[in-house]
């Protein structure tokens, strides 16, 4: 079974439990914290993914690094390690977040701009997008100086590119055809 299918099944099972417990948001945050730590800390990733390190040692490591994580989520992570599915954890976190977002009518939106946008601009954008989409918006922003100006807005799987860089690329293509 592919890693994505495994991740989807584990995420769905955990989501069903979390929804019953009313802890879906807490679990999503916990899974994202584990996933982020895997991405950012090569030592943690190396130990967790190493085949010769006993499962019990990996479980102790999870307990040590994430002492405040929900006990039920900790048990889930222990199960994932016991089944040898630790490499699927980042995808499980992503799948779980999608399930939570879908259940709570949340649309993840990422705004990329050439400069840091003021909070009032982001708040206004969030409000307008919520009105247009009739969904709750989880807005994140990042800076990419290569855009020169303007913004790129990613709404779920759609992208609205209103950057100067994109407009210059389109102008260049138009001039090449002329």
Swiss-Prot record:
The keyword Cell membrane applies. F(1)F(0) ATP synthase produces ATP from ADP in the presence of a proton or sodium gradient. F-type ATPases consist of two structural domains, F(1) containing the extramembraneous catalytic core and F(0) containing the membrane proton channel, linked together by a central stalk and a peripheral stalk. During catalysis, ATP synthesis in the catalytic domain of F(1) is coupled via a rotary mechanism of the central stalk subunits to proton translocation. GO terms for cellular component: plasma membrane; proton-transporting ATP synthase complex. It comes from the Bacteria. Belongs to the ATPase delta chain family. Transmembrane segments: none annotated. PROSITE patterns: ATPASE_DELTA. F-type ATPases have 2 components, F(1) - the catalytic core - and F(0) - the membrane proton channel. F(1) has five subunits: alpha(3), beta(3), gamma(1), delta(1), epsilon(1). F(0) has three main subunits: a(1), b(2) and c(10-14). The alpha and beta chains form an alternating ring which encloses part of the gamma chain. F(1) is attached to F(0) by a central stalk formed by the gamma and epsilon chains, while a peripheral stalk is formed by the delta and b chains. It is a peripheral membrane protein. It holds the Pfam family OSCP. The keyword Protein transport does not apply. It comes from Moorella thermoacetica (strain ATCC 39073 / JCM 9320). This is ATP synthase subunit delta. Keywords: ATP synthesis, Cell membrane, CF(1), Hydrogen ion transport, Ion transport, Membrane, Transport. One of its GO terms (molecular function) is proton-transporting ATP synthase activity, rotational mechanism. InterPro entries: ATP_synth_OSCP/delta_N_sf, ATPase_OSCP/d_CS, ATPase_OSCP/dsu. It is found in: Cell membrane.
């Amino acid at each position: 079974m592919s890693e994505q299918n495994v991740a989807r099944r584990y995420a769905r099972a955990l989501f069903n439990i979390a929804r019953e417990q009313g802890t879906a948001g807490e679990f999503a945050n916990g899974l994202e914290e584990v996933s982020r730590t895997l991405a950012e800390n090569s030592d943690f990733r190396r130990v967790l993914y190493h085949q010769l390190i006993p499962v019990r040692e990996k479980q102790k490591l999870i307990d040590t690094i994430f002492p405040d994580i929900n006990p039920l989520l900790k048990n889930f992570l222990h199960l994932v390690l016991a089944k040898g599915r630790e490499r699927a954890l980042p995808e499980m976190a992503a799948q779980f977040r999608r399930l939570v977002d879908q259940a709570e009518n949340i649309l993840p939106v990422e705004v990329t701009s050439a400069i840091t946008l003021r909070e009032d601009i982001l708040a206004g954008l969030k409000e307008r997008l919520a009105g247009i989409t009739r969904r709750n918006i989880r807005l994140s922003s990042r800076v990419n100086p290569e855009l020169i100006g303007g913004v790129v807005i990613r709404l779920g799987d759609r992208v609205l590119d209103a950057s100067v860089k994109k407009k210059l690329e389109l102008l260049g293509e138009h001039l090449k055809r002329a």
